[in-house]
């Protein structure tokens, strides 16, 4: 009976001491993994930041191109006198000599195409 108790006590002491070692090892492994995870997260965050900056640059470039190209210079509306040599009629309008009602004005006007 004493041998059983001694054996049990010996196994218990070994289990506790090895368990403590495993606990310390587990703690060290967890710290290493979290440090690696942080570095991976930092790297992933850095890559994501680069991609977002590239997208932002593309969007800003497109916006600036749109604002330069899409804005129409001041134009003359329909039925407004225009210069024959330098017509500034808005898009969809043409600078033409009036047919009936404006013959006496001797001027060109913007009309729809």
From Swiss-Prot:
Transmembrane segments: none
Coiled coil stretches, renumbered: none
Positions annotated as propeptide: 22-74
GO CC annotation, single: extracellular region
Alphabetized GO MF terms: sodium channel inhibitor activity; toxin activity
Main localization (coarse): secreted
Disulfide partners: 75-90, 82-95, 89-110
Entry keywords, A to Z: Disulfide bond, Ion channel impairing toxin, Knottin, Secreted, Signal, Toxin
Pfam families with a match to the protein in the record: Toxin_22
Region (Disordered): 61-83
Signal peptide range in chain numbering: 1-21
InterPro entries tied to this protein: Toxin_22
Subcellular localization(s) per the UniProt record: Secreted
Tissue: Expressed by the venom gland.
Role, per record: Probable ion channel inhibitor.
Comment on protein domains: The presence of a 'disulfide through disulfide knot' structurally defines this protein as a knottin.
Family stated for the protein in its record: Belongs to the neurotoxin 14 (magi-1) family. 01 (HNTX-16) subfamily.
Name of the molecule in the record: U11-theraphotoxin-Hhn1a
Native organism: Cyriopagopus hainanus
